[in-house]
Amino acid sequence: MSRSINGVSAASCIIAAMAGTPVWSSTAATNLQVAGTGTDLQNDAIVHSKKATPDGEIDESTEIVELRGQLNGKVLYHVTTVIDRKKGTLVNTGDQVFSGTIAGSAPVMLHDGAFHFEVNLSTGTDTGSVHLTDHIAGPRVRCELSVNGTGNDASGNPTFAYVGTCTFDEGIS
């Protein structure tokens, strides 16, 4: 006699574990709390333009961000940076694409055209939000993340921690 819970038997768990496949899968949406760290490889940025403004400058660049933790992969980050020295702020907006895995999922690609990061130039406090909601490839998933700066690595690249929720439309596969 074979026993299973929600269609998952002990034998299927063992086979999936040997194959390195996540065991949990369902047809219902699955919410997953995620956390990890990242590094903005700012030292290797391609600066496309710099424009002086009365209060600072506006830069457009392309950068790569490395993510570790439950989101594991790279982000191609096309960013517009507005530096306002009167307000003492640096604000990043633009478009970014994440390519990688989420909690061991199959590879995904997700776009975010609504991210927002803000740095207080006086204190160095760095906070932001990420909205990886536009599916490009892989499992249907979307992630909403909060980001907090943690300083710089030995090369001077900004580092950060992220937390949030990823929702897989049809379970994690």
Role assignments for model-derived ranges:
Residues 6, 15-16, 103:
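Residues marking helix boundaries in flexible regions
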Residues 1-11:
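Bacterial N-terminal signal peptides that target proteins for export
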